[in-house]
Amino acid sequence: MYAYLKGIITKITAKYIVLETNGIGYILHVANPYAYSGQVNQEAQIYVHQVVREDAHLLYGFRSEDEKKLFLSLISVSGIGPVSALAIIAADDNAGLVQAIETKNITYLTKFPKIGKKTAQQMVLDLEGKVVVAGDDLPAKVAVQASAENQELEEAMEAMLALGYKATELKKIKKFFEGTTDTAENYIKSALKMLVK
């Protein structure tokens, strides 16, 4: 088991980043790959969790230990796998997530991709009173500002598809952002907030 990997971020895709450590490139599946776009070709420390399946060995990466703990809590719930957990974390509303669990707000929880009513109820049952978010260690929410190219919007939509959101949902989001400019990371954060609320 690994606690973290330290190395150079060499590649960012819609689903993962590549972290090169001692000449080996590790594929790390992360909640929002474009959050790392400012760190390409720079050293980074990424907290990791390894999932071993019959057909694959996968590494999931996190910006902080608290984000990793939240991920581990989410995948402990029956019906939530690593991809769904990453999609929930990508919404970047961890305080809202904890509040929804504590107040049994099933409607809020079912807005995440692949989370139906039964899974949301299971989340409340399994995690109520157990999930604590230390806000300072988790990525901060960032408002959309007009400042980048439409290529960034395309990358953001690709990443959202990779998280499991439907193309029909994303068409509405894309239309909303047309004519604006921002980073892929900020588009993703804003889109996730819109889809979850």
Curated annotation (Swiss-Prot):
Homotetramer. Forms an RuvA(8)-RuvB(12)-Holliday junction (HJ) complex. HJ DNA is sandwiched between 2 RuvA tetramers; dsDNA enters through RuvA and exits via RuvB. An RuvB hexamer assembles on each DNA strand where it exits the tetramer. Each RuvB hexamer is contacted by two RuvA subunits (via domain III) on 2 adjacent RuvB subunits; this complex drives branch migration. In the full resolvosome a probable DNA-RuvA(4)-RuvB(12)-RuvC(2) complex forms which resolves the HJ. It comes from the Bacteria. Has three domains with a flexible linker between the domains II and III and assumes an 'L' shape. Domain III is highly mobile and contacts RuvB. It comes from Streptococcus pneumoniae serotype 4 (strain ATCC BAA-334 / TIGR4). Belongs to the RuvA family. InterPro entries: DNA_helicase_Holl-junc_RuvA_I, Hlx-hairpin-Hlx_DNA-bd_motif, NA-bd_OB-fold, RuvA, RuvA_2-like, RuvA_C, RuvA_C_sf. One of its GO terms (biological process) is DNA recombination. The keyword Nucleotide-binding does not apply. This is Holliday junction branch migration complex subunit RuvA.
